[in-house]
Amino acid sequence: MNSKFQLILSTFVVIAAFTLLPRPCASIEFHRKLSSWSNGGATWYGAANGAGSDGGACGYQAAVDQAPFSSMIAAGSPSIYKSGLGCGSCYQVKCSGNSACSGNPVTVVLTDECPGGPCLSEPVHFDLSGTAFGAMANPGQADQLRAAGVLQIQYNRVPCNWGGVMLTFAVDAGSNPSYFAVLVKYENGDGDLSGMDLMQTGAGAAWTPMQQSWGAVWKLSAGAALQAPLSIRLTSSSGKTLVASNVIPSGWKPGASYTSTVNY
C-alpha cells in the first residue's frame, strides 16, 4: 500500500509541475501581440484639413479627397512606397508622445511618395495629409497636434476594407487601340499590386503580362489593336490573384472608368 501511495503522489507532483511551466503557444502569441506595432516618423503636408497633394505620385488624382479615401492618405518613404508598388496599401497609425495625441489608431491609405527630407532620414516615415495627421489627436486638439509638425508614431500594416465600394479600373487617357494603360483602385485585402496580366477576346487568347508604368498605373504595348472585351488578372503583394473577366468592354474609351463585380 505504501509503495502504491508513493507512486500516486509522485504522479500528482509531476502533473502539477507541468501545469506551472510556460506554454510555448501562449508565449508566442504574447510576443506576436507585442510586435504588431512598429515605430516610425510622421509629418504632414498640404492644407490643414486637406488631402495632401492633388492626386499624388500613385496617380489616384481627385479620388484622394473623395470617399472612400476621404483625405485619409499618406505619402510614404521609399521603404513603403516601393517605387509605386506600395500604392493602395493600408496602415493604421497612432501617436502618444504629444499631449494632444489620443493614442487611438486611424487608418490611412498610401497614395503618394515622400522622396526627401525626414522620409530619407528614418527607415519608415509617413508624410500624412493634414486631415490624417489631425485625426490622431484628442477631440478638439487637431490644430494643436498639427502645430507639432513632426511626431514619432506607431504604425501597423492592415488589410484594406472598402466596404461596398467596387473595384475600379480607370483607363489612362493616353491609351489607344494598341496601347492600354490602367490604374486599379479600391482593392480589398493587400491593397497593393505586384503584377497585372491582360487577356484579349478571341481564338488563342492567353494572359499577357503588363508592366508597371508609374505609381499604380500598369501598361501593355500590344503592337496591334486589342480585341475587347478585355479581362484583367491582378496579383497582390502577397501573391493572391483575382480575375476580373471582361471588365473592359468592347468600345472602351480612354479616360473612362469601369467597375468589377469581384474584389479580393
Swiss-Prot record:
Which residues belong to the signal peptide in this entry? 1-27
Q: One GO cellular component from the entry?
A: extracellular region
What membrane topology does this protein have?
Answer: Peripheral membrane protein
All residue ranges annotated as the Expansin-like EG45 domain in the record = 55-165
Location of the protein in the cell: Secreted, Cell wall; Membrane
InterPro entries cross-referenced by the UniProt entry:
Expan_Lol_pI, Expansin/allergen_DPBB_dom, Expansin_CBD, Expansin_CBD_sf, LolPI, RlpA-like_DPBB, RlpA-like_sf
Coiled-coil residue windows:
none
Q: Where the protein is mainly located, per its record?
A: secreted
Q: Which UniProt keywords apply?
A: Cell wall, Cell wall biogenesis/degradation, Disulfide bond, Membrane, Secreted, Signal
- Note whether Membrane occurs among the keywords: yes
- Which positions form S-S bridges? 58-87, 90-160, 95-101
Q: Which family does it belong to?
A: Belongs to the expansin family. Expansin B subfamily.
Q: What protein is this chain from?
A: Expansin-B18
Organism the protein comes from:
Oryza sativa subsp. japonica (Rice)
